Amino acid sequence: MRQVRNGVFETNSSSVHSICIQKDKNITLPNSIYFYTDEYGWEFDCVNTASYLYTLILNSGDKEEKLNTLKNILDKHNISYTFEEYKTGYVDHGCEAADFVEAVLNDEDLLLRCLFGAASCVYTGNDNKAEKNNMCFCADETIWDGEKCRLVSNPNHKPDKYDYFYKGN
């Protein structure tokens, strides 16, 4: 989140995640999928979309309903699934990604592209090091250019190739 105070951009220094779902509908559905939980916070990484979604669901208030929706869609496509028993795992400020969870569970095509699209992934990172090449910002159309002291077009934002969801805070 960017705020302007006294004419200067400031951030609240937290995790930033760009959820990138390939738009190409040419995907191969597997016979099975494995879901595990993990810790998704400030680290710069490209992480597994299925396990990111599963971790978000397990940390939500109505996890049983959401898991049943997920299972029903996978059953419809004859995809077997294994869910690792929850021991630990979180998404930093995961409630900020509630719109992503709702969107994929209410749109079968979007969910399947999210889980099985070869180019789909979640880029994690943080806003403490706002460099143009940090992929955690790719869901943003613009990015702060410290050298030019202004927002510029984000070279990593490719709306023709991806549906994006942004988890800030």
What residues fall within each predicted segment?
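Long, non-globular targeting/processing and low-complexity regions
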Residues: M1-E10, S15-N169
